From Swiss-Prot:
InterPro entries: UDG_fam1 (IPR002043), Ura-DNA_Glyclase_AS (IPR018085), Uracil-DNA_glycosylase-like (IPR005122), Uracil-DNA_glycosylase-like_sf (IPR036895). It holds the Pfam family UDG. Keywords: Cytoplasm, DNA damage, DNA repair, Hydrolase. This is Uracil-DNA glycosylase. It comes from Acinetobacter baumannii (strain SDF). Gene3D superfamilies: Uracil-DNA glycosylase-like domain (3.40.470.10). The gene is ung. SMART domains: UDG, UreE_C. The keyword Hydrolase applies. Belongs to the uracil-DNA glycosylase (UDG) superfamily. UNG family. GO terms for biological process: base-excision repair, AP site formation via deaminated base removal. One of its GO terms (molecular function) is uracil DNA N-glycosylase activity.
């Protein structure tokens, strides 16, 4: 793809890891992305507080390059409370109380693999091992859940999933809840493993279908079957 000087300049301003930037070039230059940039600029002009901080918006992709992805855990949008969101789905910054969904994830991990329940909720260690912790929508206004839906992020993260679906094989996609499962309908089940369960939020998990889903052991079993190093799910203290 031959880029004009203007297109190259536009791409240079995107703070995105190079392997992802190359694979997503056509989307990053699309009207969807232009519209999304305009929306975020207007939000900042209106002095709205946006989470996560701008340098962390692409954290999931920047920490886990395209060729390193082994697992995708798909979330919906970032936490909307102060100092929570760090650009990784379900993850929070150290020193912040564990959100209920993450507590339930840790409980299931302990039941499934005997991994001690972590005192912090920073999942960076998972991301560094190849777990792409991808929200469908990458920003949110403080205190306003779903406020940045339908502004272009969904199309961007669809493009991320399409790149993984087409360019890679033997990735485990973990889809908790109906929202993630709808988004995951585009995944080729012959090339990849798709694991589904209820959402870990207390409302959904307590109705059944999350606890006992054993996605962590199933993930590692599949990776090992395909000669891929399994994930060490235990977080540092």
């Amino acid at each position: 793809m031959q880029l004009t000087e203007q297109q190259q300049d536009k791409l240079s301003k995107v703070q995105l890891e190079e392997s992802w930037k190359r694979s997503l070039t056509s989307f990053l230059l699309s009207p969807y992305m232009d519209s999304l940039r305009d929306f975020l600029f207007q939000q900042k002009q209106a002095q709205k507080t946006i989470y996560p901080p701008s340098k962390q918006i692409f954290n999931a992709l920047n920490i886990t390059p395209l060729d390193h992805v082994k697992v995708v855990i798909l979330g919906q949008d970032p936490y909307h409370g102060p100092n929570q969101a760090n650009g990784l789905s379900f993850s929070v910054q150290r020193g912040v109380a564990l959100p209920p969904s993450l507590r339930n994830i840790f409980h299931e991990l302990h039941t499934d693999l005997g991994v001690p329940v972590s005192r912090h909720g920073d999942l960076t260690k998972w991301a560094e091992q190849g777990v792409l912790l991808l929200n469908s929508v990458l920003t949110v206004e403080a205190g306003q859940p779903t406020s940045h839906h339908k502004q272009g992020w969904e199309e961007f993260t669809d493009a991320v999933i399409d790149v993984l679906n087409e360019q890679r094989e033997h990735i485990v996609f973990i889809l908790w809840g109906a929202y993630a499962q709808r988004k995951g309908q585009r995944i080729n089940r012959e090339k990849h493993l798709v694991l589904t369960a209820a959402h870990p939020s207390p409302l959904a998990a307590n109705r059944g279908g999350f606890f006992g889903c054993k996605v962590f052991s199933k993930t590692n079993q599949y990776l090992k079957q395909h000669g891929i190093e399994p994930i060490d799910w235990q977080l540092d203290a």
